Amino acid sequence: LGAKTIVFEHNVDALMAYQEFLYDHSFTSLIKCYFIKFNEKFSVKYATALIALNKRDCDGFERLYGRRPEMILPITSPKVDLSLVLGLSVVNKPFLLFVGANFYPNIEGAIWFIEHIAPYISLDLRIVGACCENPTLAYKTIPSNVKLDGYVNDLSSYYKSAVAVVAPIFKGSGMKTKVIEAMSYGKSIIGTDEAFQGIECDFSRIGAKCNTAEEFIKAIESLSDNLFNPYTYQVFSDKYETSTVENR
């Protein structure tokens, strides 16, 4: 029909599907791999313009389908008026925050943190989101300093009250929405290489980039009591705040 189309790819979905198959080795995941790659191939082929979230995804599309996206447009988030956000009144102990949907990289990351980090730190870990309903996590024996809060009415109060946000994510594609969201609240963030994909900053100032249990524990032990990280908030305002990107 000659219609022009713009495809904004938030992941290299074929790679995500393959990672899921490696995670659960199910026949369903294997079938999904083939169908997703088939559909993605034609989406990339026939799009008038292709947009990706970061350089890694551009490389992935070029490697799989022979086409490099014409534009990189990162995930953004609206500016938060922090003066209007109330802290958690029912929590009086310092805590780390993990936020995640019921998605296998989140489940894998949360369980890894519970097993390898939580028993060796003094801070509580509060896990928020649909990931808490996943049976693998919901029925797991957890240390006393881990709280599965599940769905919450006001996520902003958790962000404001947390000492830091942790993102122990080891698989994925695209960018991590919850990391950008945490930045919009000016939080210190301790995450993996995967968690920080597409984010340009001094990771030692935003929190820490960690990929081993030892690195996570060391970074957590080095956290200050300051609940607001001005450097994180400045990076967000300069690079990932929605209106800033729209006005470029």
Role assignments for model-derived ranges:
Residues 72-144, 148-160, 210:
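Conserved catalytic-core segment of nucleotide-activated headgroup transferases in glycan assembly
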Residues 204-214, 220-227:
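Conserved acidic donor-binding segment of nucleotide-sugar-dependent glycosyltransferases
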Residues 165, 178-181, 188-192:
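Short hydrophobic beta-strand element within catalytic cores of glycosyltransferases
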Residues 156, 177-184, 198-199:
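Short alpha-helical segment that forms part of, or immediately flanks, the ligand-binding pocket
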Residues 225-248:
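A charged, aromatic-enriched C-terminal amphipathic alpha-helix characteristic of glycosyltransferases
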Residues 6-38, 92:
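Acceptor-binding helix/loop patch of EC 2.4 sugar-transfer enzymes
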